[in-house]
């Protein structure tokens, strides 16, 4: 494989550059990187790319039996479409579930007092379970009749 990589460099000559890192560029802290990952996860799971391309409305509306327009947050019977608020709500739930797993992982640190460990376990389980069951409720709102055993 190395001989295959060597073929272009028989013709090309690499320049002799002395590059230095700019003095203003510093390594970001672990918490900064973590925050960027969580924010990007929130935006991606919320469908920000879909929202930019398709430009859906933030909420929809439906006509009730009396002829009045009522706002709806979920685009029912459409798996491949969403309103902006629907994407943000779902993204919040996914992010909350992910943070619940991270909190559960952090509760295993050896130097945490017993009360704090219990509180972290409780908060982590609540985040994960609430996220899971609310995602099921959202699926029932999105696709009525789905998940009805």
From Swiss-Prot:
Pfam family, one: OST3_OST6
Membrane topology summary: Multi-pass membrane protein
Compartment(s) where it occurs, according to its Swiss-Prot or TrEMBL record: Membrane
Entry GO CC: oligosaccharyltransferase complex
Biological processes per GO annotation: protein glycosylation
Protein family: Belongs to the OSTC family.
Subunit field text: Specific component of the STT3A-containing form of the oligosaccharyltransferase (OST) complex.
Physiological role: Specific component of the STT3A-containing form of the oligosaccharyl transferase (OST) complex that catalyzes the initial transfer of a defined glycan (Glc(3)Man(9)GlcNAc(2) in eukaryotes) from the lipid carrier dolichol-pyrophosphate to an asparagine residue within an Asn-X-Ser/Thr consensus motif in nascent polypeptide chains, the first step in protein N-glycosylation. N-glycosylation occurs cotranslationally and the complex associates with the Sec61 complex at the channel-forming translocon complex that mediates protein translocation across the endoplasmic reticulum (ER).
Protein name: Oligosaccharyltransferase complex subunit ostc-B
Organism listed in the record: Xenopus laevis
